[in-house]
């Protein structure tokens, strides 16, 4: 079911009973640690400290910049078309990709940036290994920014999920914290003693998917409290490091293993193993519809649909 590696491979478009099929496999020259879709035909890659653009149609990779001085851990596309990147050099950069220019370099964290998410009103929120989550606000006319600390935890903050009611969930060690962005106060928390939490992602129905260090996947229902709505059966054996939602509401997860898993929240007892990579999967991104991309330490980028 997977594509072979080491050369460019395209597969004919069998629907495979609705399960993802590898449509394209591209060999990479560098290890890629982060990935985001710019549009349905272009991906932005974080290849160590270099930002690159991959054109799916031409199957070509173009360097953008190596402004970061450390590995790029996270990339997101902002609603205004710009790109935000977080790095092991402790900085966040905002990019105009068309001009290949850095618009802002955000200084304030004292350790690795693990995650970035966009907020309403020209803001982003970051999660860092310095145990702090910061909110950053931009003044585009003055080309300035301000920031404040939302949470100062006792452990590193690895991930952020942004909810529709002006609230966020922070993943820190074995705890999940619910914060109100208006009051800047913690409203609730959930202790997950076994495995700890690495990644949280908001879903289109308002729930939140949680990936644990022991390979388990949870779905949370968010009220005034954080309530575990669904516990999926054991699929991964190692830390879940990425979660994406497809337009059909199914979830795809990757872990410190070489296989992906497709999950259906409506049928939590079922799972589908997606094989094709030969080494640990480092990053995963949604493209459009049921199309997504993955990158592995086997130095291949694969497009699935």
Language-model segment annotations:
Residues 10-30:
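A short helix->beta-strand "capping" segment at the edge of beta-propeller domains
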Residues 21-26, 60-65, 101-106, 143-150, ...:
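A short beta-strand motif characteristic of beta-propeller blades
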Residues 25-49:
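Beta-strand-rich domains and repeat architectures in extracellular enzymes and scaffolds
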Residues 25-32, 65-72, 106-113, 150-157, ...:
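WD40/WD-repeat beta-propeller blade N-cap
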Residues 43-46, 83-87, 124-128, 168-172, ...:
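Conserved beta-strand element within WD40/beta-propeller blades
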Residues 49-52, 70-73, 89-93, 111-114, ...:
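Short coil/turn segments within WD40 beta-propeller repeats
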Residues 56-59, 97-100, 138-141, 181-184, ...:
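Short loop/turn segments that connect beta-strands within beta-propeller blades
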């Amino acid at each position: 079911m997977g594509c072979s590696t080491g050369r460019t491979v395209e597969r004919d478009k069998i629907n495979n009973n609705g399960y993802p099929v590898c449509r394209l496999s591209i060999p990479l020259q560098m290890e890629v640690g982060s990935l985001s879709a710019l549009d349905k035909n272009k991906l932005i890659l974080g290849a160590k400290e270099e930002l690159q653009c991959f054109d799916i149609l031409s199957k070509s990779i173009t360097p953008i910049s190596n402004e970061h001085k450390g590995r790029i851990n996270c990339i997101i596309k902002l609603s205004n078309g710009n790109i935000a990147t977080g790095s092991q050099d402790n900085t966040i950069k905002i990019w105009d990709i068309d001009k290949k220019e850095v618009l802002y370099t955000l200084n304030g964290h004292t350790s690795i940036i693990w995650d970035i998410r966009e907020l309403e009103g020209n803001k982003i929120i970051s999660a860092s290994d310095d145990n702090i989550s910061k909110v950053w606000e931009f003044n585009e006319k003055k080309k300035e920014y301000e920031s404040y600390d939302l949470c100062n935890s006792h452990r590193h903050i690895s991930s952020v999920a942004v909810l529709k009611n002006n609230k966020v969930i922070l993943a820190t060690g074995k705890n999940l914290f619910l914060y109100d962005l208006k009051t800047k106060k913690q409203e609730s928390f959930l202790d997950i003693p076994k495995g700890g939490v690495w990644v949280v992602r908001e879903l289109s129905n308002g729930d939140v998917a949680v990936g644990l260090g022991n390979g388990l996947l949870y779905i949370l229902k968010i009220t005034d409290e954080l309530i575990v709505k669904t516990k999926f059966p054991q699929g991964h054996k190692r830390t879940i490091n990425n979660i994406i939602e497809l337009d059909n509401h199914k979830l795809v997860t990757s872990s410190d293993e070489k296989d992906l898993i497709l999950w259906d929240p409506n049928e939590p007892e079922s799972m589908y193993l997606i094989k094709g990579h030969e080494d640990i999967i480092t990053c995963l991104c949604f493209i459009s519809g049921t199309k997504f991309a993955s990158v592995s330490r086997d130095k291949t980028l694969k497009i699935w649909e």
